[in-house]
């Protein structure tokens, strides 16, 4: 069986590297910043978690189905082109989703300072009008001073004369029957004394009573102020607007993921089979570096463009539309490259029950069961970082350029760490690598919970590279040692797709509600404790499991065996005799 006669191996690898590079740039344009954009739409943490959980769930189970159905050359080519072409339009659907509050305040494009309500309070939309601090306050009646508490700004204790807006969960605010007073707040920032109290921001609130319209909506103000327990207040936003934004966002994200999820797996399967026909699969293993390089360049490039083009392209709606426009442009470039992507014409026969067999292999080995459980847990915890870390950084004053740079540091760290893979595997073993990865991830989460400045996230990103790479190195080594012949890729896809993806989905669903009920700092501290407890349990169980000894027949057969001597000394050095004696002694 020969490879596609129109392709030589060097040209095929060149196109594959370019495709991975462009796809990395494409993914980096939107994926790290999607939850930040959803927050700017006015969606609270539970709804953002639900959206991301749905996205991960579709990716975990829809991609293998499409890869199973697309086996022929024509189907794979059509799926690659259709996925990229459809994702161009699907990504632009997110730009059309209206925010919960269309009258919300945006950051001004003229360089002056401003405040966005959804940027200040995760899970809360405060429809307030921000006015300049230099305005004369004499023309505003009923003026009094109030303090708005935001994450990252500490409220000084003992000042009972100031009102603090807490637990403003818009999506849970019940409508109050009867007469109500609707107030429009004009907030004037008071910046005096910020040197002594840098975490305290005081606003002058001017309340003007407005007549109440039927249904409880005041003119020009979408929020109704209703009393809650203590001094907490809730703004009763239109549930219809919230429901509309959430449903449109859910539909757009789900449709978008249905189109994009199969792309990576189908492309990888096609390239691997193409190289397998010419016995060049060893060159397939280095292609992941090009995707990470593309993501590193893309995440820095798109954040630089956002600051320059966002105000030029946007007149209304939330910031961040440049991410989706950039994604569409790079997807078009990837579409052009995909036309030349190597796909074998001759179909390689593979049993259709590989996934089921891979699952049975995992279920029959206690070491793989522990590794699968660890992968699910890590996926759940990593999803909380991916979903809400940028929220945490935003609350501490970080811009998107700093956020992109933090992602690039982590990705470049993974590339620089790769040459040490063999050394770490030899020194630490698979269990040691898992322990190293879990420890680094726990320390990383604990550090995130105590962020203090806009730049403070950058030094810890090296641990992100170690924690991510260490886990997948351990998975790869376990698959290589314990998998039966020609089941390595199926087992690896099971860990990366089903187990890790299911964990990300579960973590997204749960994480949003934890953020709503407590805070991001509490979420990260709880995840840190969970990781340390699981690490202790993992090490205690691992010691009690029988020590497996698998003969790597594929490696043994590749060794050059000298048969020039039939002496007893030659027999003692024979690799097959050694392997049989080791197996018999165990």
From Swiss-Prot:
The gene is MFSD6L. Keywords: Membrane, Transmembrane, Transmembrane helix. It is found in: Membrane. This is Major facilitator superfamily domain-containing protein 6-like. The lineage of its organism: Eukaryota, Metazoa, Chordata, Craniata, Vertebrata. The chain crosses the membrane at residues 50-70, 78-98, 246-266, 287-307, 326-346, 361-381, 400-420, 433-455, 456-476, 499-519, 521-541. Belongs to the major facilitator superfamily. MFSD6 family. It is a multi-pass membrane protein. CDD domains: MFS_MFSD6L. It comes from Homo sapiens. GO terms for cellular component: membrane. Residues 133-160 are annotated as: Disordered.
């Amino acid at each position: 069986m020969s490879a596609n006669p129109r392709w030589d191996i060097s040209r095929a690898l060149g196109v594959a590297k370019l495709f991975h590079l462009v796809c990395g740039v494409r993914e980096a344009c939107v994926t790290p910043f999607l939850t930040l954009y959803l927050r700017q739409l006015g969606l609270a943490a539970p709804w953002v978690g639900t959206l991301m959980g749905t996205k991960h769930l579709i990716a975990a189970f829809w991609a293998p189905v499409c890869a199973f159905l697309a086996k022929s050359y024509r189907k794979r080519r059509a799926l690659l082109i259709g996925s990229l072409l459809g994702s161009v339009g699907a990504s632009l659907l997110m730009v059309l989703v209206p925010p919960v509050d269309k009258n919300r305040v945006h950051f001004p494009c003229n360089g002056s300072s401003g405040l966005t309500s959804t940027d200040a309070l995760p899970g809360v939309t405060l429809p307030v009008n921000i006015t300049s601090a230099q305005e004369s306050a004499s023309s505003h009646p009923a003026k009094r001073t109030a303090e708005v508490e935001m994450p990252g700004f500490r409220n000084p204790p003992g000042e009972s004369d100031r009102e603090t807006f807490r637990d403003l969960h818009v999506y849970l605010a019940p409508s109050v029957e009867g007469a109500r007073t609707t107030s429009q707040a004009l907030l004037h920032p008071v910046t005096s004394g910020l040197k002594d109290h840098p975490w305290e921001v005081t606003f002058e609130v001017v309340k003007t009573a407005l007549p109440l319209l039927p249904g409880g909506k005041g003119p020009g103000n979408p929020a109704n102020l209703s009393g809650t327990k203590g001094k907490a207040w809730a703004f009763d936003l239109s549930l219809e607007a919230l429901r509309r934004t959430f449903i449109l966002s859910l539909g757009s994200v789900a449709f978008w993921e249905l189109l994009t999820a199969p792309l990576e797996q189908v492309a990888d399967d096609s390239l691997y089979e193409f190289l397998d026909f010419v016995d060049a699969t060893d060159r397939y293993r280095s292609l992941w570096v090009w995707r990470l390089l593309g993501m590193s360049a893309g995440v820095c490039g798109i954040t630089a463009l956002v600051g320059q083009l966002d105000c030029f392209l946007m007149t209304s709606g939330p910031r961040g539309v440049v991410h989706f426009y950039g994604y569409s442009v790079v997807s078009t470039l990837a579409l052009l490259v995909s036309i030349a992507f190597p796909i074998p014409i001759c179909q390689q026969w593979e049993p259709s029950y590989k996934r089921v067999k891979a699952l049975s292999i995992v279920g029959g080995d206690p070491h793989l069961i522990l590794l699968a459980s660890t992968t699910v847990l890590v996926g759940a915890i990593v999803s909380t970082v991916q979903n809400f870390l940028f929220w945490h950084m935003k609350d501490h004053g970080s811009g998107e350029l700093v956020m992109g740079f933090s992602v690039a540091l982590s990705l470049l760290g993974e590339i620089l760490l790769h040459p040490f893979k063999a050394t770490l595997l030899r020194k630490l073993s698979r269990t040691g690598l898992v322990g190293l990865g879990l420890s680094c991830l726990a320390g990383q989460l604990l550090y995130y919970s105590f962020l203090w400045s806009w730049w403070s996230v950058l030094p810890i990103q090296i641990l992100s590279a170690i924690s991510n790479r260490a886990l997948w190195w351990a998975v790869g080594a376990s698959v290589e040692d314990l998998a039966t012949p020609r089941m390595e890729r199926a087992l690896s896809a099971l860990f990366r797709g089903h187990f890790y993806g299911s964990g990300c989905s579960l973590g997204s669903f749960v994480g949003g509600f934890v953020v709503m009920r407590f805070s991001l700092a509490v979420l990260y501290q709880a995840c840190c404790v969970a990781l340390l407890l699981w690490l202790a349990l993992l090490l205690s169980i691992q010691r009690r499991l029988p020590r497996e000894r698998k003969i790597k027949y594929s490696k043994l057969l590749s060794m050059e065996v000298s048969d020039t001597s039939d002496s007893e000394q030659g027999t003692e050095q024979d690799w097959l005799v050694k392997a049989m004696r080791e197996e018999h002694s165990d």
